[in-house]
């Protein structure tokens, strides 16, 4: 199974596919599937990618500098007209099943200094939705911990 993941990752890299595309596309063939309770195929894809390509994903010049994307999150909140617009969009993303995108929007609100009770509640909802759909030990432990932190 891991040979398949390895070979598909390297094949995708050679075809010029980006990391996130490969993380979303690569799956274990049904005859090798034993569940992902302890690890995740997407995590293995990332590890294989970074083993060969390193930390630089070749997607943005900003990867080469010490300034994280969160440094401009307050600017994004301001440009969006405030946290409420981003919270509404995060709610729409959650309702549409785009939980990971909802988390990105909530991170912008919270990292941009506009975090409030509503953003924390929404983040709890997203984490709970993600928790409900996983049977992975490490991911469920992380999500439960984050829910506890968000609620405190």
Residue ranges and their predicted role:
Residues 1-152:
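Accessory terminal helices/loops
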